[in-house]
Every structure is written in C-alpha cells, then in structure tokens.
C-alpha cells in the first residue's frame, strides 16, 4: 500500500483492509479523486450542483428561546435545510460525479436511517444512474418514509435479513455486491469510514459545512465559536464540521456518540470511548467487539448512529486529544428533540438531537458562562416522527 497517492492512515487508524481483488479498484478511485480535486471543470460542476440543486450555503440559525436566562449564544448549522433533508447530499453528489468520471454505470450504497439512501437515490435520478440501496431489514421497518422516498425516485431497495438486520449488515452486503461487480459499479459509501480513500473523499466532500460555518459565524459574531458540536456515528457530518476548525486551537471540537440505553447496559453505539481497536469494514479503527474479536451489535434509538465502529480520523483526533468525544442517551436525545421543536419550531433528526442534547447539557451546567456554541443540525426529523410518537405515546421502538 506504500504506492497510494494520499496517506491512507490517520496516525495508526485507517488503511485499506480489503480483499486483494478490490485494491486496484480503490487505487483507481483514489487516482480519479486526486485528478478531480485538481480539475477546475469538475469543481465547477460540483459547486453548481451544491448551489443550484442542493441549496447551499445552508443557514446558520441563532436559537432565540432555548438559551433564555443564560449567557450562551447557540447557533445551529442547518444541514436539515439541504435538499434531501440531511448533510448526506453533499458528498453523494461529489461521489456520483467521480463515478461518472471513472466510467461506472451503476451505483450501490448502504443506508441506516435511510438519509444516505435518499440522497443517493435523488442524485442518481438527477444524474441518470441506476441505483441499488442495501438496508437492514430492521431499519426498513423503522424508516418506512425514507424507503418509500427511495423507491419513488427509482432506487431498488434491498432489505438485508442477515445478522442484526441493521447498518453493519447492509455494509457487508454492499461490499459483497461491489466485490462481484466492481468493473461497472461504484460503491457510494455513506460515511467517513471504510477503506482508504473513502474517509478522505467523504471528508473533502463534506468540509464545506465547517467552511461555511466559519464564514457565517465571523460575519454574525465577529469571532470563532468556543465549541462546535456534532453527532458521531460513522462520522461524516462531524468531520465535515470539524475539518476547517482543526487548526483553530481555541475552538473545541466535540463529537457526540450514542449512549443508547446507557453505556453500562452494553446497549450503545459508542466505540470511540468504549470499544477497542480492530479491523472492520476495511479499516483499522475502534470497534465494539467481544474478547474473541467478534463484532458486537451496536444500539441507538437513531438508526443513523447505530454503527459498531467510527471513522479513522475521529479515532486519531480522539487519540491526540484534539477533539473530545462524549455520549448521550436515547432519553436525553428525545428530550432535546422535543425541546427544539417546542421552543424553536425546528424538528431535528434523532442523530442531530444527540449533539443538541450535549449542547443543552453544557449550557445547563454553567448558565452564567458567556459562550458561543454551534451545533451541526445534520438532518431534519420528519423520518423520526413515527418512532418518537410511538415512544412518547406508549409502546417502544
């Protein structure tokens, strides 16, 4: 792997742990990506799609009511306003343009909450590419509005009945398909994880989130925030927010993992803080595994955070102490979901509600502290209203 164009590692994390057959395919992808990054025509087409199709830049909204009685200013980066309803659309457009550049004629993807699947389906419809989405059977059930959306836009949705019937199983099936069809097919990975060069590609195609946030907050407040906060599953919305702030040492980077029913119960999705390093999904990164190295099932109320590993750049930022990673339970996320809806008229995705919950916790801990916080509101909550309704009005998810 010494002949990759870009460094495949972040510290000791990352790499390209895939079947031999996929190594040339990943190198072809890396080559195409490096060329595209230096091609003004590609960049112009990507920028045009982001602006005129997806609706960038997204707003930076000051919360008027949530912080009443405190000295905190809390802003939300509104990725929920992006076409498709979440940050996923950003990098999907970039990857499909890359796939076309490589002459691929078919797109496959995995999805958990269905947001990446929806983003892939809408971009494939618009850019005229056939599309197959693998989704855990359990997620197909709990995210039915998104399944309908994908099918409406022409995607073939394959429910995966293996293992825990969730995101990790969908990832495995997508990998299998890709291994058999790589000559014609691009695997449009949905998060900043997996084998090199995916974590780097996804970061580069999401980093406009942090770049815009920096410009907008300087315009509004004349200074950088004290902290930016984002939810972490695989880690794409968080790395998109963090990337442009990594070199700003006065800005705290806070990633929020799902504590599920409580870390102590074992039913969570917090491998960064409560997992061990291993090889999974083509990369070396923290994973939830038992003492024999078997992957354990992660759990979160939020399908998009229900993943037993995490992107390698987050593992590295955690190791060097540049970013802080914390966890929030289902219950705390549900409370934040309701608070934002009730007090600001914005219904957030359950994923984003984890980040918001931690921001609210910080504010409550020290209401007299003057601080400027930005939460990445990575997606809208339409897809979650049935799940939340079920929990709040009897029954469980």
From Swiss-Prot:
Q: What is its EC number?
A: 4.2.1.20
Catalyzed reactions: (1S,2R)-1-C-(indol-3-yl)glycerol 3-phosphate + L-serine = D-glyceraldehyde 3-phosphate + L-tryptophan + H2O
Q: Which InterPro entries match?
A: Trp_synth_b_CS (IPR006653), Trp_synth_beta (IPR006654), Trp_synth_beta/beta-like (IPR023026), TrpB-like_PALP (IPR001926), TrpB-like_PALP_sf (IPR036052)
Give the family, as the similarity comment puts it: Belongs to the TrpB family.
The Swiss-Prot or TrEMBL record annotates one GO molecular function as: tryptophan synthase activity
Gene Ontology cellular component terms for the protein in this record: cytoplasm
Q: Which organism is it from?
A: Haemophilus influenzae (strain PittEE)
List all membrane-crossing ranges: none
Mind listing the UniProt keywords for this protein, alphabetically?
Amino-acid biosynthesis, Aromatic amino acid biosynthesis, Lyase, Pyridoxal phosphate, Tryptophan biosynthesis
List, separated by semicolons, the cofactors it needs.
Answer: pyridoxal 5'-phosphate
Q: How does it assemble?
A: Tetramer of two alpha and two beta chains.
- Descriptive protein name: Tryptophan synthase beta chain
Recorded metabolic or biological pathway in which this protein acts: Amino-acid biosynthesis; L-tryptophan biosynthesis; L-tryptophan from chorismate: step 5/5
Purpose: The beta subunit is responsible for the synthesis of L-tryptophan from indole and L-serine.
Domain of life of the organism encoding this protein: Bacteria
> Which top EC class applies here?
lyase
N6-(pyridoxal phosphate)lysine (modified residue): where?
Answer: 88
Which Pfam families does the record match to this protein? Answer: PALP
